[in-house]
Amino acid sequence: MSFSTLMDKRERGSFDSQFLIAMPGLDDGNFARSVIYICAHSDAGAMGFIINRPQQITFTDILLHLKLVDSNDAIMLPNRTREFPIQCGGPVESGRGFVLHSDDYLSESSIPVSDDISLTATLDIVRAISNGRGPQKATMMLGYAGWGPGQLENEIANNGWLNCPAAEELIFDRGLDNKYERALALMGVDARMLSTDAGHA
């Protein structure tokens, strides 16, 4: 199921604006110890973004690739722009960029995900960020995680994931190393005590 189809068909599914937290038994290399923010969930499937996987490419690299700046301009970019976070959002459409952001920035192409968070996947927000006119809180994801009809529900029922309400501060926090433990802590779970047989919230 494509990103556009899932977003077009989205309803207020039971896992909208939830975190999925990988159980220890989930050994898929794409998702082991991952925390995923679910943006859309309906009968058509689900999609979301891994929020604790670093990406080697930098925002400056992206600006150069898109020819929004040249090499001379890139040197002059302010630190806030050069250090803008890029993450691996998931294995689907991994060459495509998506920006999760606070709702103080909205364009015609922005899609509300929750009361406070929107998603924009067009060049206008990249330009705005590069010019210092972007949202106060934002992170760029390359790719996303997607599930077909009923697939996510089955994975949760089979103890592949824990789920809990998402916390905005964790989505936009640039410290990725301990997000897994912090997401579990939202549920009162100590990662050291978690077994592959635990249930879900």
From Swiss-Prot:
It comes from the Bacteria. Coiled coil: none annotated. Belongs to the UPF0301 (AlgH) family. This is UPF0301 protein Atu0781. Pfam families: DUF179 (PF02622). SUPFAM superfamilies: VC0467-like (SSF143456). GO terms for cellular component: cytosol. NCBIfam families: PRK00228.1-4. InterPro entries: AlgH-like. HAMAP family: UPF0301. It comes from Agrobacterium fabrum (strain C58 / ATCC 33970) (Agrobacterium tumefaciens (strain C58)).
